């Protein structure tokens, strides 16, 4: 009946992560997740654009709805935010969504492409920043209400 449109994998920072096991090799300086504050790694982040467009969601900010869900997940789990290693394109999507992500370090992937080790804070203020400047803010607020009840 339903089809998966987007998703992300969350791993508590106290467990082995892609950052600690794999991605650390792509950075000049050691990158580690803090284990003294509640946070997580986010990986396997995706949005199926074909599925979005074929399900009459074209023009709807589905990526921002995913970002709201990520924030709600963190807030409910008392995480201060998420750490990730992302491509230049993904970093640009976060910035375009008005999410004030912090670049901790730049690195190079195995393909020689620039990647970023980033921190994405999670809070009600971040959610407001993501929603406030979007022309579909009413739709995003509706999605937010659904997400709060999950």
Pin down the residues of each PLM region:
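Conserved beta-strand in the GNAT
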Residues: 3-12
